[in-house]
A protein has these predicted regions:
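N-acyltransferase acceptor-side catalytic subdomain
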Residues: 1-392
């Protein structure tokens, strides 16, 4: 049988609100393992709270394909016109510097990504493989026809990375640290799989926090009150202040996702002396067939207690994963310290196209060297695997 070619109408939208939420989320639901960050509610909250908008250097250019026959959304991607490289977690500052030194503008650039979110997941939502290929090709054509230096697709799935590779884009790899729930019944069950020294260190860290009189509340869904959001937002801002930088997100954003996607949120609040002193926010997704993934996202403290960061942002979340039957905990960007706590290295992907031929060649050679370095780095990390080999 000859397959009829479907005609699609391309849309370039300046706000997520221009896409019907139900149609967008229907594409998300088709994913084998959808992430909450691609949900319409999350992307719209970034826009409504003015975190990812023109004024912050994130001009939405959401790209959609609509089936001309049915009028239904067939594919969509979160795309932004960027005037800087903040909030991306795939670092191209050196590329931008090289452009500037040679008098060539690097910005604006096109970015297909979830703002401020280094989480691997589908970037081209689609009803089927044909629509996915067509939208991927549309992204590249848009970059080629626009006055931009480049197109970058951050943290796509491995399958998508291969698709972009087949279109001539350059692939880049990175490393994150993920924890796998090997059917643990409780936290001690997990500790029992670690080498003795690692196990001892974790117990010592937890004891320090306990002995300091710190207790914890784990809140999900509607149990998170506005006072909790206000305190968490204060902690979040403090983390950025401690690093002499400006926060990307704000209280309005956190309140908004608290209202629109409460079933995906876990807020941990640490308390001492009857008052809150630290907090961590995680996002999680239950899989239809059981299990699911928890994403550690933000943490902050207004008082210092030794090892409080590890307890609040790791051990409390690990316990939640075990109790809730979630099978993966993605710890986010960077952090070799996670290795000693049971998180193993995982390779992430990005895809890049540069319009300037000479720069494209130079970056291609750089990425070859960098990929070799990444592979050697992962091998080295695996040599320091914290789990028992055969016996303690």
């Amino acid at each position: 049988l000859k397959h009829e070619r479907i005609d699609y109408r391309t849309g370039i939208l300046s706000s997520p609100a221009e896409v019907p939420a139900a149609e967008w989320n229907a594409l998300v639901a088709r994913d084998a393992r959808p992430t909450p960050f691609l949900r319409h509610e999350f992307l719209d909250a970034l826009h409504v709270a003015r975190c990812a908008v023109d004024a912050t250097g994130w001009s939405p250019r959401f790209v959609t394909l609509t089936d001309e026959r049915t009028g239904r959304l067939a594919a969509a991607a979160p795309v932004y016109l960027k005037t800087h490289s903040y909030g991306e977690y795939v670092f191209d500052w050196a590329w931008a510097d090289a452009y500037q030194r040679n008098g060539v503008p690097y910005y604006p650039k096109l970015l297909c990504a979830v703002p401020f979110t280094p989480v691997q997941g589908t970037r081209v939502l689609a009803a089927d493989d044909d629509a996915r290929r067509r939208l991927a090709a549309t992204l590249l054509a848009l970059a080629e026809q626009s006055d931009v230096s480049s197109l970058h697709v951050l943290f796509p799935t491995e399958t998508e990375a291969q698709l972009f590779d087949s279109m001539g884009m350059m692939l880049r790899q990175g490393v994150q640290f993920h924890w796998i729930n090997d059917g643990y019944r409780h936290f001690d069950d997990f500790l029992g799989t670690l080498e003795q020294k690692k196990r001892k260190n974790i117990r010592a860290e937890r004891r320090k926090v306990h002995d300091a009189g710190v207790t914890f509340r784990r809140l999900t869904g509607d149990a998170i009150r506005d006072a909790d959001w206000r305190f968490f937002s204060r902690c979040y801002r403090q983390t950025y202040r401690d690093h002499y930088s400006s926060p990307y997100l704000n209280l309005e954003f956190f309140r908004t996702i608290g209202q629109t996607m409460p079933d995906n949120l876990l807020l941990v609040i640490a308390e001492a002396g009857g008052k809150p002193i630290a907090s961590a926010l995680a996002v999680y997704q239950r899989d239809a067939g059981g299990g699911g993934t928890l994403y550690g996202r933000y943490w902050g403290a207004v008082e210092h207690v030794p090892c409080l960061h590890f307890e609040t942002a790791y051990y409390q979340l690990l316990e939640f994963c075990i109790e809730a039957g979630l099978d993966t905990f993605e710890g986010g960007a960077q952090g070799e310290h996670k290795l000693a706590r049971g998180f193993l290295p995982t390779v992430t992907h990005s895809a890049h196209w540069l319009a300037h031929p000479a720069f494209s060649d130079a970056v291609s050679r750089f990425l070859e060297r960098e990929t070799n370095h990444i592979h050697a780095y992962v091998d080295e990390l695996q040599d320091h695997n914290p789990f028992k080999r055969d016996a303690d």
